[in-house]
Amino acid sequence: MLAAYLAERLSARLFVPLALALALAASAGDVSLGVLAVDAGFALMLLAQFRSWDDLADRGRDAVSHPDRVIVQAASVAPIVGFSGALAILNICVAIERDGSGIAVSVLTMLIFTLGTWYALRAGRTAAGDHLLLSKYPAIVVVIAGERVLSAPVFILGSALALYFAVFAYEVWHDPASPLSIGGHR
């Protein structure tokens, strides 16, 4: 079930370019292949964690709008819960190991707490809620960058902001159910 879920919801066609964009935004201009590959790998792990959280939180709504999804049809979501929990722990460990400044782990734990609280408390989709969910992408840039944000704040934070606007535009364009969408529900 987990393999089918990952194949369905973590399409390499979408997530590899997104991971590369996140890694480039966090690069501080160092686009050496080794750094880019490690950063993109970390980005993929973070994206998988937060995609699975999004899908777990949306399972009830997806039962109506996307009844064919693996997570909706599954008798138990325990494998996905275990996977996302293990990824959260692994990502925290990677953030600690990669960044001695504490920036990465601080931003990551704040993101985990904020989104976890939002998922637990939200009653439905709102424009503010969708903006909050999209803010995970610039936060992920800072998590990947870690202490590099201290030496190149304009590059990294500017890139993170540009990435936010790109994912916002994508959300407006591709998800007619989003309160942010042109023509979507309000």
Model-identified regions with their sequence ranges:
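Multi-pass alpha-helical membrane architecture of UbiA-family
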Residues: 1-186
